[in-house]
Regions:
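Donor/substrate-binding cores of folate-linked one-carbon enzymes
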Residues: 1-101, 111
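Internal anion-binding site segments
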Residues: 85-157
Length: 157
């Protein structure tokens, strides 16, 4: 089994916390699932979620995912060892209308390159919030060959 930082099948792949903010989701979560040959497409054991607020950053959701992943393992370890746990094929979620998306690192990273033309677009601030973390390069505006980094609140706590 694997803990995945994203609600499956909607958020397969990487940087799901960042994409949840950019996509203006109201919830973000993690999934305990079986490993299969495809990326994050194994049967689901359990999903845990938390609210995404207008103030949530990528770092906030990353920290929440660490806590939730621990809870998933803690809450399911006995049933996993006994073979009595849930095992729900992701296709059941898809058949009930859940989206099935796969996020790739490079596609997500490209979203952090902002322009001043779009500064009043609500997505602009969501991108800034999503990439506000010490774990990767923040969102930026290019001026010539220089990058001006845009932060939301990282470093103020």
């Amino acid at each position: 089994v694997n803990t995945h930082g994203g609600v499956l099948p909607e958020y397969r792949g990487s940087y799901c916390n960042i994409n949840a903010i950019i996509n203006n989701e109201t919830e973000y979560g993690v999934t305990l699932h079986y490993i299969q040959p495809g990326v994050d497409d194994g049967d689901i054991v359990e999903i845990k979620t938390v609210p995404v607020t207008d103030d949530s950053t990528g770092l906030d959701l990353y920290k929440e995912s660490e806590r939730l992943c621990y809870e998933l393992v803690r809450d399911n370890i006995d049933s996993l060892l006994q073979g009595t746990n849930n095992r729900i094929p992701q296709q059941q979620f898809i058949d009930r209308g859940h989206a099935c998306n796969s996020y790739k690192r490079n596609d997500t990273v490209e979203k952090k390159d902002l322009t001043l033309v779009d500064i009043n677009n609500p997505v602009w601030l969501r991108v800034v919030r999503a990439f506000d973390s010490p774990y990767h390069e923040p969102a930026y505006i290019k001026v010539g060959d220089k990058k001006i980094y845009v932060r939301y609140r990282y470093g103020t706590e």
